[in-house]
Each structure stands twice: as C-alpha cells, then as structure tokens.
C-alpha cells in the first residue's frame, strides 16, 4: 500500500505513505511477518494480486473442470510471431497493397505461401497444409492439388502488372540510384520442362538448368523484377530482353550495375541508345579497357598519394573517352564513357601467390605423369617443339615465362566503365553494393527453397513467382534488422524465435477470438 504526493519546490512526486504487505510469489501474495504481527486476522487467508488490488482467493469466481475443458477444446495454439512481423513489413512497404490490387481473390494464399518459404525454408509445398493448420499464415491450408491449381492460375499478365507496380514504387534510376542486374542458374532433374537446358552451370556442369534473371534495388534491397530464362542463354545476350520488358513496365530512366558477364561493346552501345545509365565491370581483353590500363597502371604502381582514395582503400585513376559508332541504321553516334582503373597492392600480392600455388600444383601433376585439363594450365604451359608424342608429360610441356609476365602486369588491377559516374571512388562504392544481388541469389537458393526446381511445366512460372515473393519478404526483413543494428546473418535465428511466439485462437459461435501468449521480455522492442 502506498500514497504519493507532489513536492512543489522540487517539482516531482514522492512517496508520502508506504506500507509493505509482503511479496508476490507465483501469482500468490506471501504476507510479511511484520504485517501479520500487526494484522493477525489475515494469517490464514490466501490473497492474490489482481488489478492492483489484494483480493482474497475465496472471493474469486471458481471455474469447474467441465467449463475449463469446454474452453480448451475450442482453443488452438498457433505459431504466429514470424508471420505477424512479415505481414506488417509487407503492409508497410506496399507489397501487400500491390498483391491485393493484382490478385484480389488469391492474395491471402499467395502471401501465406511466400511466408511459408521464408519461415520454413527446409520444408516443401507437400507439407504446406499440415504446417498451415498449426500456424497463423492466413489464407487456406491448401493441399498439393489446390496449390498446383493456384500456381497454374497465375498469368503472365498478372506477373507483369505486379512487377510494374513494384518498379513504380522504387526510386531506382532517379537521383543517381542504381539497380543491380544479374543471373543465376538453378539445376533441375526435370526432363520435360521446356526451359531446362544445358549451359554454364557453376554448381554442377553435368546437370541441365534454367536461368533466373533478377533486378535488385540497391536503395532498399528489394528484388523488383525477375524472369525465367532458357538455361542455354548466355548472360551477354540478355540485356535486349531486359530493355524490352522494362520499357513496358516503366517509362522513367534506369541506371544499372552489371558484372563482367554482361561486358560487350554491343551491350554498351545498346545501353547508350536506350539512355540507360550503367556501371559495369570491364574485361581486360576489351580493347578500350586494355589500352587504358596500359596508360594508367604505370602511374598507379608508383603508389603516389595523389592517386590514393581512403574511401575505397586503393589507388585509382579515371580516363574519359568518346564512344564512337557509325552504322547505316543509326548514323554517326558519340557518347561520353568513363573508364575507372583501380590498383590494390594487397590484391596484387594475393593474386600472384594464389596463381603461383596453382602453377606449382600443375608442375607436381606433370611429374606424376598427369596432364591437367584446366584453362590456366593451357595458359601458362606450352608444348615443347620437336618433341615426340611418346615422351613423359614433364618433358613435353614447359612453363611459358612470357604468359606469366603478361599475367603479372595486370595483377591487383580491376576496371569499371560508366556512362554516368565520373568519380572513380563513387563508381566503385556503387559497384560494391552489387553484392546485394549475390546475397539475394544465395537467399533464393538456400533460404527460400530455390536450389532445385521440382514442378510441372504449367506450374513453373507460378512456383518461381511465389519464391520471388518470399525472397522480397526475407530481404525486407534483413534490411529492417540491419537498420536496427542487428546482423542480417542472424535472420534465421530471429525468425525461429519469432515463430515460437504463440497466438491462441478460440472458436466461438460468432467470430474466432485471438489471444497472444505472454511475450518474453527479450523479444519485446
């Protein structure tokens, strides 16, 4: 018991009167000895503390076992914390509104399936109905047949409408914001999917695959656009398809970040003509890149302070050239092009050391009578002239010193090209953010069930769309965690803890009532 009063001089409240009754133990009041000595009449009475009052247990209403069992039989625990957070994020970032607009009859089921992939990445859709019955995912606990029907019902026009809405919400391409574009391969065991084909599969060259192209907003990390492609299509030939799609989806200028896989004079000219800003990794065998490296590297290797940029931690220099083109279709064209050359001494030492170890391993294999079948072996070892074919491999091949000199000339060097960004440090900082698209692919494959494609032809596009939605939700969650000072790598653990929070659903004759279990202090904001 206590009574507070106001101190006018100190302008604060203070305790005017306080009486200690006892302490609270497991919901029951344990009266203190001093209080009982002064109030012996309360010795044998059990008290509980409710609504900030001491109430005798005998005055509380009693509930018989039959009533308790009746309530419990209509009350079901649901894992709900993770789905609640993901749905709130979807609501705040506009994803939920876009789903409702494009899929007015199925948005709940689509969102539920996407959240299922995020929360339970190790499970497949065959377990969805069982999991959904014990989770607050929303939508209906669909069985495999109903899921297939839902996936098949998602049309190309609906997917285009949805991505158009997401692209228009993005600020990419405005105020010098960039979108990162890249592709990944997904292996498939299917022998009937039309887009499955053999190509450059980094994970398993012996397996056919499909390709997924993905466009990521570097500002907020959200995937904005994706496309399922034939597995045999090379990266260098994809940009034309991208521009055609984006022209239909968005009428504002875009800026792209591209890796070396898209580096070709044809692609650069196509981006110039389409007024697409870009920062791209340049291959060393590209003529304009090789010429610029030869001109700038001698100065950079001197490590003069004027070439050092502390913001990127390496030496850099820029050369502006004019990109010329003359064709019958377009006439004479001229565009400004900025070539940024970077030199990192630590990277140089690492590249030389790694290649030295690889060369030594080739020599050891030759000593054993093996001829390595590797590009770098063919680059640094040449067949000796006038040697019969029957000699031992170690006597048939010799180390090519000139190739090694050519290799070391560009060690520690890397080159970027840009149509817009004139500053070398700024260009590299933007390019480094491209690792978001790499992380997105890893999340797609490892955390969202995208390592293998197992579905029928008619459901393929729908399955990829659901996985794309789940990737959006996961990356949005990671960005929230990062802004709050948490490590995004802890996302699986955060999801697991959130999913342990229970929501009780009590069925009534009218509308089901929902009650949250007490949330532990460490999980509260």
Sequence positions of predicted segments:
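Short amphipathic alpha-helical "interface-anchor" segments enriched in bulky aromatics
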Residues: 128, 427-454
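Catalytic or ion-translocation cores adjacent to nucleophile or general acid/base/metal-coordination motifs
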Residues: 227-228, 233-244, 248-251, 255, ...
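Glycine- and acidic
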Residues: 108-117, 133, 222-229, 251-255, ...
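An anionic, glycine-rich sequence signature occurring as long contiguous blocks
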Residues: 208, 228, 275-430, 499-524
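Secondary-structure transition/capping motifs at alpha-helix termini
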Residues: 8, 135-141, 157, 172-173, ...
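Polyampholytic, low-complexity intrinsically disordered segments
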Residues: 285, 460-525
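Dynamic "connector" segments at or just before major functional cores
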Residues: 2-180, 184-192, 213-232, 240, ...
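Secondary-structure capping and boundary motifs in well-ordered enzyme cores
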Residues: 108, 143, 177, 206-209, ...
